[in-house]
Each structure stands twice: as structure tokens, then as C-alpha cells.
Amino acid sequence: MEKITLAPISAVEGTINLPGSKSLSNRALLLAALAKGTTKVTNLLDSDDIRHMLNALKALGVRYQLSDDKTICEIEGLGGAFNIQNNLSLFLGNAGTAMRPLTAALCLKGKTESEIILTGEPRMKERPILHLVDALRQAGADIRYLENEGYPPLAIRNKGIKGGKVKIDGSISSQFLTALLMSTPLAENDTEIEIIGELVSKPYIDITLAMMRDFGVKVENHHYQKFQVKGNQSYISPNKYLVEGDASSASYFLAAGAIKGKVKVTGIGKNSIQGDRLFADVLEKMGAKITWGEDFIQAEYAELNGIDMDMNHIPDAAMTIATTALFANGETVIRNIYNWRVKETDRLTAMATELRKIGAEVEEGEDFIRIQPLPLNQFKHANIETYNDHRMAMCFSLIALSNTPVTILDPKCTAKTFPTFFNEFEKICLKN
């Protein structure tokens, strides 16, 4: 297995231009495909998850041109549902941001009735999709499970989404609601979506609604408890769509600045539509000096203190707080993060296991993690297992800010969202 060892870093300084957001990139591609008109998507992320979406769209008859550096994509919109001529099987890797929205979009009524199979890597077959499928079936969709009930692979017949009253469980993943919201404007009738349980990761729903507005569709949001979507609408191309820099990817660099220097990230700022921009607020609460601009966020070292906080609203960036916590005074508790368990790996168990290898004292709860800080001279050099999870690899790079090296196994797993991460990280590092 490939590995990379990061030597101890004495300080960090510099500016990082962020790659495009994964969440925004895949939403933009799908909305552009369903819209009337041609859309030029710029600052598109070049990563595995985006490639899976692009390959699927091509197989579904969407025509597009991708620039040589793969960051600009011009998409000819279909002006409605996918027009599939033959039965198809689409492989989506471990890309939840492709699997969930495509599951819903492929239920929309095509000119010719076809069956589409959606499948992926072994981990994808362990990632739940029951709540989305249940909701789509209530709206009249034809979906069946091919292996285990509640999990991909799925067989979908594009017979249409009728609409009507639909209940969806919001407690596991906001991507289920995102998928439903993006497809129901093209349903035959109006849809009223009622949320069961506590809706997790609300800022990701805000991203979805903002992007739908950019493509000409409005949704009535009643306090995140009920959503009303008019049927028989059309998405309209905005002609150009700029993908913001990835706020989750910003977290590693901002944390590094807060721990040991000064780092600025560009491509997101105070007006970003991404909830993970609020990661900077958490760092500020811990004591870091944060500066906000229109198109940048800067984090600067100050003594950090532990924090006890519900981080349901920033689940991806919250992982970075878990490794940052080792450098703070006092314990840190990250709460209400059950959905870590249904991500690329069971992130709660993975995080607790790998932090203990470094020497940290950690308590893993069903939906929380409690971390005690570690004196700089007590960090242990460990081989960090990444579980084919890009965020594990990137979070644990921060361990090199101690007096101890860290070895990251399978570093190329960052290709899911940030293939050049380790090169970019090295640019801000001053070695001991």
C-alpha cells in the first residue's frame, strides 16, 4: 500500500486557492443537464466523484464539453427529464452526491420507458438509501432493490414522479431531501414534503435551494419541517454558473493556521452559500484569530481552548475539529454527529481508532466524540489508516504540526475531492 510520511512542521504560512466544492459541482452538473439552454459551469472540481457524475450524464445522453484542465464544463441542457433509449447500468463509485440525486432524477418520466441500474463500490452498497427510496415510492416512483433492502444497487424504471404528499426521514442524511427537492419540480403534480425526525445538515439544504433558485425554480420552505414544490416546472439555465471553492477542504488549511501560523484560503468568503464556512466560527470560538473577506477567510494562531458543541450543521468540517482538538487546552466534545457513521466509512469509529494510535484519550459515543488534548511531546508516530476516506487522510495531516511525524496510508484516497491536497499542504509548511 502507498503511504506518505509528513515530517514535523515548525510553522505554516501562505495562501491557498481552493478547488471547487464537490457538493456544488455535482448539483450544478445535474441541474444544468435537466435545464433548458446551455450552461457553462466554471471552477468545477476535478475529482473522482465529479467524474462519476460526468460519466453517468454522458451515458444518459447529455452532451457536454470539458476543458483540458477539467474545471470548465459546457453542458447542453435536456430541458426536462432524461430521454433514455435503452436499459442501462451506471457505476457511481462511492459518490453519494451522484447516487442520491440521480436515484430521484432517473425516476422522472422519459419518452421511452427503460430500466436503469445504479451501482457502485462495495462501500456504496453499505450506505443507506431507504429513506429516499421510501419517499420516492410515496410519490409514485418505480424502484426496487437488487441486493439488500435499503441499500444500493437499485433498479429504477423511469415511469414518472406523480407528486402529492410525501414524508421523508431527515435524520440520517440531508442528501435524501436534496435529491427529492431537485427532482420534484419536474413531477406531474405539486409535491408537499414533510420532514420526519430532526433534519440533519440543514446548511446543505440551503445550498440545494439556493442553486435551484439560480436555475429558475423556487421552493416554499416552512421552517425545514415542510417544503412545497410546484410540479410541471422547468429548470432554466443561468448561462454561467461559478462553483465556489470547497469550504470543507478549506477547513484543513484554516486549522493549520490556527494551530501554528497564518493561512488564507481564497474562493470562499463571508457570503458563501456553504454551511462549512461556519467552521471558521468554531475555530474563532476556540480562540483563533479569524479574518473574513468577500472572497477569502484567514486563520491565524492564538492559544486554542477545547470546545463542547453540537456540530450537526457542519459534519464534514467537524472532523477537522477532532484533530485540531489535540492542540487545544482542555477537552473537546463534538456532539450530534451520528451521520458520521453513514459517510465514506464509519467516521466515528475510524476517528476514535486513529486518534488513539497517536496517543490521544478518546471516548466514542453513539453520536458524539470526546477528545482530550495531547502535550506536543507525547504525540506518537503512527501509521494512519484512511479507510478509503478522503477526509481521514486530510484531517490527520494536521498531526505533523506536533513535534512528531505522521504516516498517512493510501494518501491517494484524497482524489475523491482534492487530488492535489498533499502538494497544496506542503506549500504552506515550514519544516523543522
From Swiss-Prot:
Pfam families, alphabetized: EPSP_synthase
GO MF assignments: 3-phosphoshikimate 1-carboxyvinyltransferase activity
Pathway(s) per entry: Metabolic intermediate biosynthesis; chorismate biosynthesis; chorismate from D-erythrose 4-phosphate and phosphoenolpyruvate: step 6/7
Residues that span the membrane, as ranges: none
InterPro entries named in the record: Enolpyruvate_Tfrase_dom, Enolpyruvate_Tfrase_sf, EPSP_synthase, EPSP_synthase_CS, RNA3'P_cycl/enolpyr_Trfase_a/b
Ligand binding (phosphoenolpyruvate): K22, G96, R127, Q175, R347, R391, K416
Binding, 3-phosphoshikimate: K22, S23, R27, S173, S174, Q175, S201, D316, N339, K343
Subcellular locations according to the entry: Cytoplasm
Keywords: Amino-acid biosynthesis, Aromatic amino acid biosynthesis, Cytoplasm, Transferase
Presence of the UniProt keyword Cytoplasm in the record: yes
Residue positions of the active site: D316
GO annotation (BP), single: amino acid biosynthetic process
Catalyzed reaction equations: 3-phosphoshikimate + phosphoenolpyruvate = 5-O-(1-carboxyvinyl)-3-phosphoshikimate + phosphate
EC number: 2.5.1.19
Gene Ontology CC terms: cytoplasm
Family affiliation: Belongs to the EPSP synthase family.
Subunit structure as annotated in this protein's UniProt entry: Monomer.
Protein function: Catalyzes the transfer of the enolpyruvyl moiety of phosphoenolpyruvate (PEP) to the 5-hydroxyl of shikimate-3-phosphate (S3P) to produce enolpyruvyl shikimate-3-phosphate and inorganic phosphate.
Name of the featured protein: 3-phosphoshikimate 1-carboxyvinyltransferase
Organism, scientific name: Haemophilus influenzae (strain PittGG)
